[in-house]
Every structure is written in C-alpha cells, then in structure tokens.
C-alpha cells in the first residue's frame, strides 16, 4: 500500500532455520566454522553459594546471602579483581532473578529490561585463592566472568533446594515471583492429586 514491506522476525528466523521454504535459485548465505585451541589457555575456577528465602504465598525470592571464592591466579590489582567479581555477581543475579526477554506477536519487547539495583542485592561475601597459572609469565587467569557465570546456577540450586520438600523439581529462569509461585502451586496440586488417587 505505502510501498513498504514488512516481515516478522520469527518468520525470518524460521525461513533461515528450515531453508526448504527458500526459492531454489536463491542462495541462503555463507557458513564458516573454525576452532581455536590456544596453547596458553588458563582456567580460573571458583565456588559460589547463594542463600535464599522464598515467600510461599507470593513466590518472591529474597537473596539473603551470597558467598563466592574465586581463583584468578596471581592477583595484580585486588581492588579491580573484587570489582570484577561484584559486577559479575550483579549481572548473574539479574539474569537469575529479573531479566527476561518477552516479545509480543510482532517480535517487539513487551517490557523494559529489569536489572537489580544495589539495594536489591545482599552484601557479597567474597574471597580469592591463588594458584598461579603456568601458561603465562605473570601467573594470571581471568576473573571478569566469574560472578556472571557462577551466580545463576548458585541461585537456581538454592531455590530448588528450598522448594524440594514441596515437590518442586525445576523452575525456569528468571526466577520471577510468578514463575516460582506457579511451580509451588503445581507441585502442591500434583501432591493433592496423588493423595486423592490413593
């Protein structure tokens, strides 16, 4: 009508994925695969523990404590290393509890992204161990992603541990009050049906 054509993002993705709907004389693009195997890679590691309290009536998850011990090899600047961990923890906690990417039928976001504010986070209890890397002269390892990688599974495990006695075996991220409450209600309903069926 107005000279413009539109197509939904999901239709583009579907056509690119399946490929059989594309005309035979139309190329579907380029593909390239490459693997990089660095000889001097170092692997940081750590242990993360989350302590949560869950309101059974609302599904609200309150992160009470967060403990993390990470090894990033020789620490050159302790303040920057701590800042990297704290920033990563905030990012990982946001992924676990708040951030969602809901789209409407046209592929547009339905809400603003929700990220945690500092008043929504507990005081982080962090420490470091030092095991120097033998793959570089400084003995350093990475620390930038430690918090972001460790936080989601630590929070997931804490939530499932808290809800396990109710029969909840899994909840999808992010662990919003609605999702947690739905998981609780489904587990309680399932248990009630088991009792009735006996």
Name what the model sees in each region.
Residues 1-198:
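C-terminal catalytic domains of large/alpha subunits in multi-subunit enzymes
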């Amino acid at each position: 009508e107005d000279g413009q054509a539109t197509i939904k993002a999901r239709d583009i993705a579907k056509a690119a994925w399946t490929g059989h709907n594309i005309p035979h004389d139309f190329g579907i693009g380029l593909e390239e695969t490459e693997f990089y195997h660095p000889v001097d890679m170092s692997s940081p590691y750590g242990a993360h523990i989350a302590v949560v309290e869950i309101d059974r009536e609302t599904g609200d998850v309150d992160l009470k404590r967060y403990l993390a011990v990470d090894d990033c090899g020789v620490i050159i600047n302790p303040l920057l290393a701590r800042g990297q961990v704290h920033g990563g923890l905030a990012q990982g906690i946001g992924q676990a509890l708040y951030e969602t990417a809901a789209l409407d039928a046209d592929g547009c976001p339905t809400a603003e992204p929700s990220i945690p504010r500092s008043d929504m986070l507990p005081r982080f209890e962090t420490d470091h161990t030092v095991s120097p890397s033998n793959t570089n002269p400084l003995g350093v390892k990475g620390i930038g992603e430690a918090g972001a990688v460790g936080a989601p599974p630590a929070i997931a495990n804490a939530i499932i541990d808290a809800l396990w006695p109710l029969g909840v075996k899994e909840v999808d991220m992010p662990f919003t009050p609605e999702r947690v409450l739905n998981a609780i209600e489904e587990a309680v309903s399932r248990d009630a049906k088991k009792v009735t069926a006996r």
